[in-house]
Amino acid sequence: MVVQSMLSGTQPGGPERVPANNHFAAHTGPSYSIEQITSEDDLANLREDWNRLSETAESPNVFTTFDWFRAWNQRFTQEAPRRRRLSVLVLKKDGAIVGISPLINRTASRFAVVVRKLEFVGLADYNDFLLGNGPTGQIEAIMDFLVQTQDQWDLVDLRDLPKTGNTLAIVESALSYTGLIYRILPEEDRSPYLLIDAPWSGMVSRLSRSSRHTLRNQQYRLERMRGEGLRVRVIENPQEEPELLEKLIALEGQKRVNGKLVPPFIGRYPEVFQSLFDTLGPRGWIYVALMELGDRPLAWQLGFRCGKRLWDYTKAYDHAFSRFSPGTMLIPAVLDYGFSHGFEEYDFLRGEEPYKMIWNTGYHERFRLAIWSRRWISRARAFVYLDLKTAVYRLFGRSR
């Protein structure tokens, strides 16, 4: 189903009409109309325009691509079909698609209180709206749409929005006249990054003496193994590598944090990552760095190529070779690849683990945008989900 809207007015409770064809209609300014996509068939029809917007974005972001959204949404909907539905907002101007807000409507429960949330699909380090030219007007149109459809949701909870450019200022300005209540919070985890302005040999020379000593010793030990068949590859087309996904999953089964085995990530969602390999791989979004001893994988890193940036998404290594730090020592190979191919930044993504701190030259920050209406039921549910939930999580040492 497509719910179509032309927005008008900025006050909550403004005039709205539901025609017999189940299309919601209202009016908001002459520039933009909005369609709310709620079915898989209508979502599939967006592929071409969605890909166009994501590939021509000023800051390309794999987490805002059509195939990322669809693969994860299909999996999560299978797990909880009654609690999730599409709520993708498509912005049009003069009949052409100029922006997309990739949202889903999810029913969550906290302390026996049911909350209807609009949110991003999840498992992304950077979420965002897909906006073309005129982002100010497009964000204003999105916020107006939220006002006119506030009976469909209790809380808009947008996590991990990148704190770059003037997006935050535009959002606050757009919200200031809607009558909606909102809160902007910094996300706890920052994303360390490293500028790629030299090959690895040049970068390592800038590190502390102890870090240089450690990394060069590790590199020396690995170099000695080249005679035994050690090699490192950066695979640009993972979809063409036979049984690559199976190798990643097998090695991930040994992954440890603080010495303890951790639940698999890729192994939990093999069909999702196979879909991402098949769809995003041919379009140049994915790379896999692989360290092998003969035919035996020792370490891998799955990452993304987003414009001039490399994003380190997830990795694993053979615990039997942990003394060689094979996971960490994939980074020099990826940095050399990045430098030789014209990339300008290596982003470690979410988290400030010690090995990242050796390299990083700065941090990217993200923020959380929570919106609710002045209706008492929305206020009460937002309080339970945001304030009460946060207090309980802090009491028991949890986050997010």
Regions found by a protein language model. Give the residues of each.
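Intrinsically disordered, low-complexity, positively biased terminal segments
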Residues: 2-20, 130-185, 201-202, 228, ...
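Active-site/acyl-donor-binding loops of N-acyltransferases
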Residues: 2-32, 36-40, 105, 168-206, ...
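Short, flexible turn/loop "capping" segments at secondary-structure junctions
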Residues: 27-29, 119-123, 150-151, 223-227
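A conserved beta-strand-loop-helix scaffold within acyl/acetyltransferase catalytic domains
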Residues: 33-117, 161-191, 195-201, 205-322
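Noncatalytic linker/hinge segments flanking ATPase motor cores
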Residues: 76-77, 128-132, 139-145, 197-204, ...
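Acyl-donor binding region in acyl/amide transferases
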Residues: 84-93, 105-188, 307-364, 370
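A short, structure-level motif marking secondary-structure boundaries and short turns
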Residues: 204, 261-262, 318-321, 336-338, ...
